């Protein structure tokens, strides 16, 4: 992560130095006031690619140093809100307000097709079994260390004592909104400029993955980030990615909460979910079906209306 941050920072600095009108005045020295004036004067509808990268670096650096200042006595509610709102959402919102001409467009808050919204809801449910399998496969390849496992167990014990609606609000809905506005909103929109579709999808996914402290979570989040990036590109905004992200997190938390509280699988869900030693999991046949359904639903996202097509083409200009 440190190496990536350095590379991104160097690339951003090179971009700035390439613009002589920005970095130098008559005396040939760099002037902070002149540079800030340039950023304000030359604002675009969406962020410049270098500004989007800078935002991602700021989020990673903030997440890294925050762990040294958070009190061990702080509640998980307080920590979650501070991280999501203060370290992830706030930087991209402030940069959108100060460095772009349209914060709404910079955050990619656009009207969404009804067919895309419907597909996003169904994808959220259909994709989750495959995501669960991916997580188990990653853990089997890269086992979680004993110290990390102990920390996770302590965290889960603290979290799952709460009411389910509190957990869903703080760990499903809030991260979905904040993280999507940041990574598939401001950062993705800036990287998408100049026909940078592949750049936007991959870089935003990696930055999204690196915000997760545990290696196994980071890998699975990066893979999910690639899919969310594809959805963000095809739908022309963040609304559908927020839906998929929220449903995916919500299902994981609900299944874990029910298992921790020793709840039996409802009869209506026995055809898809089973309860075992490791908690609730999907039946093998449903895991296969979910892959087929997810592929079919993703095809719906490739059907754009003219309005959505115009929005995406304008972002890529």
What are these regions (language model features)?
Residues 246-317:
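C-terminal membrane module of polytopic membrane proteins
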Residues 178-203, 230-237:
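Membrane-interface helix/loop boundary segments of multi-pass membrane proteins
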Residues 76-122, 140-143, 298-316:
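Membrane-helix interface linkers and caps
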Residues 73-80, 104-178, 193:
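Juxtamembrane helix-loop-helix connectors linking adjacent transmembrane helices
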Residues 1-3, 156-176, 276-296:
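Hydrophobic alpha-helical transmembrane segments
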Residues 5-46, 300-317:
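Junction motif at the cytosolic side of a transmembrane helix
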């Amino acid at each position: 992560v440190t190496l990536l941050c350095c590379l991104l920072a160097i690339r951003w600095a090179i971009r700035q130095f390439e613009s002589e009108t920005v970095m130098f005045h008559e005396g040939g020295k760099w002037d902070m006031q002149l540079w800030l004036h340039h950023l304000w004067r030359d604002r675009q509808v969406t962020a410049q690619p270098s500004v989007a990268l800078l935002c991602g670096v700021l989020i990673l650096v903030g997440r890294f140093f925050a762990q040294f200042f958070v009190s061990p006595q702080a509640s998980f509610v307080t920590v979650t809100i501070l991280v999501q709102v203060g370290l992830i959402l706030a930087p991209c919102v402030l940069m959108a307000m100060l460095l772009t001409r349209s914060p709404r467009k910079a955050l990619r808050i656009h009207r969404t097709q009804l067919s895309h919204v419907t597909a996003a809801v169904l994808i959220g449910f259909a994709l989750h079994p495959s995501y669960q399998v991916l997580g188990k496969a990653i853990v089997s390849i890269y086992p979680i260390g004993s110290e990390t496992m102990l920390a996770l167990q302590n965290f889960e014990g603290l979290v799952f004592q709460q009411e389910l609606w509190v957990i869903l609000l703080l760990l499903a809905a809030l991260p979905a909104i904040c993280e999507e506005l940041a990574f598939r909103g401001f950062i993705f929109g800036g990287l998408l400029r100049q026909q940078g579709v592949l750049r936007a999808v991959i870089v935003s996914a990696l930055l999204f993955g690196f915000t997760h402290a545990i290696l196994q979570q980071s890998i699975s989040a990066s893979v999910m980030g690639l899919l969310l990036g594809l959805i963000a590109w095809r739908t022309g905004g963040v609304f559908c990615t927020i839906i998929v992200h929220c449903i995916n997190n919500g299902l994981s938390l609900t299944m874990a909460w029910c298992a921790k509280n020793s709840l039996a699988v409802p009869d209506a869900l026995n055809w898809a979910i089973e309860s075992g030693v490791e908690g609730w999991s999907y039946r093998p046949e449903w895991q296969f079906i979910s892959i087929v359904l997810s592929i079919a639903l993703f095809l719906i996202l490739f059907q754009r209306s003219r309005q959505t097509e115009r929005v995406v083409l304008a972002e890529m200009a």
